[in-house]
């Protein structure tokens, strides 16, 4: 196995069914998501700001490193939060001193909530069938 000479860090983030792998390496600020441009994959500004918030808090800029992101499963919002967690973990691997700052903003917390399973005798997880007295 050949070792990379470029100093990069890889981390994984998860949220619900979404799994995101983030590769952080020194560069010019290019962001690639599943082979597409960052703005093309995440068209809303709020999504892009949410994803890049750990980078802005630690480095203060997005132009110092390149990101290669691979996402599988889940919906758009789950993918956004999974990617943010992956980016925060990658930053932590690269810069251990930033742990307190990342933790105080809640970027290192994995949201444990998942979809509750459907129960038999019910329409959904908690919703019952209509009750008829007679």
Curated annotation (Swiss-Prot):
Keywords per UniProt: Ribonucleoprotein, Ribosomal protein
Molecular function terms from GO: RNA binding; structural constituent of ribosome
Biased composition (Basic and acidic residues): 98-114
Biased composition (Basic residues): 115-134
NCBIfam families: PRK00132.1
Pfam families to which the protein is assigned, alphabetical: Ribosomal_S9
PROSITE patterns: RIBOSOMAL_S9 (PS00360)
Any one annotated GO CC term: cytosolic small ribosomal subunit
Region (Disordered): 98-134
Stated name of the protein: Small ribosomal subunit protein uS9
Gene designation per UniProt: rpsI
Superkingdom of the organism of origin: Bacteria
Family, as annotated: Belongs to the universal ribosomal protein uS9 family.
Any one biological process term the GO annotation gives: translation
């Amino acid at each position: 196995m050949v070792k990379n000479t470029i100093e990069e860090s890889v981390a994984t983030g998860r949220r619900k069914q979404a799994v995101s792998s983030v590769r952080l390496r020194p560069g010019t600020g290019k962001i690639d998501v599943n082979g597409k441009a960052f703005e093309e994959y995440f068209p809303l500004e709020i999504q892009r700001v949410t994803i890049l918030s750990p980078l802005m808090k630690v480095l203060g800029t997005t132009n110092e490193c390149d990101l290669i992101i691979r996402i599988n499963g889940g919906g758009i919002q789950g993918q956004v939060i999974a990617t943010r967690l992956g980016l925060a973990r990658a930053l932590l691997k690269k810069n251990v001193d930033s742990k307190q700052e990342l933790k105080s903003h809640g970027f290192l917390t994995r949201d444990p909530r998942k979809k509750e399973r459907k129960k038999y005798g019910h329409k959904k997880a908690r919703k019952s069938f209509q009750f008829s007295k007679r």
